[in-house]
Amino acid sequence: MSNLKQLRTRIKSVKSTQKITKAMQLVSASKMAKIKSQIANSNFYIEAISKMMSDILSIDMYELSIEEQKFFNTIPNKANLLIVMASQRGLCGTFNYSIIKQVKNDIKELENKGEQIKLIIIGKKGYEALKRQYANYIDSYFELPKIHDENLMLQVKQKIMSAVENLEVSNCVIYFNKFKNAMTQIMTRQQILPIEKYHDDSKVDDDYYEYEGENLISNLINLYVNSQINYALLQSRASEEGARMTAMENATNNANDLISKLVLKLNRSRQAIITTELIEIIAGSEAV
């Protein structure tokens, strides 16, 4: 009987866990759907900013100032700035593994070349994975809020802008998971700086863009860096929720399979007990 009690307790426990994983699956699916719509809007914004910068830089009347040139040229003998986007929480499968693996490989390659390294880490899981081995390289760490927060984006952008303006870094690369679908996330290594000068053979009318005030290129650079960070954050968030949704779906299915096996085992145990009792009753009656 004690065995039956243990089986019932275990079935109850697994069912409770199954309810939690199912709820987490539904929450992640809802969050992922919302973020996907934000990604669609950000794609258009990034394309517009890139096109505008390409057009303006192709116009002879716009010349880059010394400060602006820092964002388009590689500054020798300065640090490589690596921005790592991981998750704040776990239970999202291998979401963080591919990112951390690529970052470690790149750090090793840069170390072999004798180059300087700076790390900006976004997300608790990324920080925990890198702090022991690369604590000296970590310049900043940001926790990832539960919802998409523009303040985080602005803080990261300010760190990047300040590092470039103060000639502290030669380039900036961002690591994030790009969302394909709920089951597939693509590890992406994207260069933010120096900004590539787009080449467009089409002639742009000098009068096409009108801008009142100074610092046109500087403002565009701000918008460009901001949009790149925002895009990566959204992609990373969508990928995280997709990975978590898939992981929780698998956990729910596994729980269901386990419940079926435990129920079968329970029924067999009960049947065995009943059979044993019947045999004892029959044996007793025959003895009489």
Swiss-Prot record:
Membrane topology classification: Peripheral membrane protein
Organism superkingdom: Bacteria
GO cellular component, one term: plasma membrane
Any Pfam family: ATP-synt
GO BP: proton motive force-driven plasma membrane ATP synthesis
Major location (coarse): membrane
Transmembrane stretches, start-end: none
Places the protein is found: Cell inner membrane
Keywords associated with the record: ATP synthesis, Cell inner membrane, Cell membrane, CF(1), Hydrogen ion transport, Ion transport, Membrane, Transport
InterPro entries: ATP_synth_F1_ATPase_gsu (IPR035968), ATP_synth_F1_gsu (IPR000131)
MF terms (GO), sorted A to Z: ATP binding; proton-transporting ATP synthase activity, rotational mechanism
Family: Belongs to the ATPase gamma chain family.
PANTHER family the UniProt entry points to: ATP SYNTHASE GAMMA CHAIN, ATP SYNTHASE SUBUNIT GAMMA, MITOCHONDRIAL
Known role: Produces ATP from ADP in the presence of a proton gradient across the membrane. The gamma chain is believed to be important in regulating ATPase activity and the flow of protons through the CF(0) complex.
Subunit structure: F-type ATPases have 2 components, CF(1) - the catalytic core - and CF(0) - the membrane proton channel. CF(1) has five subunits: alpha(3), beta(3), gamma(1), delta(1), epsilon(1). CF(0) has three main subunits: a, b and c.
Protein's name according to its UniProt entry: ATP synthase gamma chain
Organism expressing this protein natively: Rickettsia felis (strain ATCC VR-1525 / URRWXCal2)
Gene behind this protein: atpG
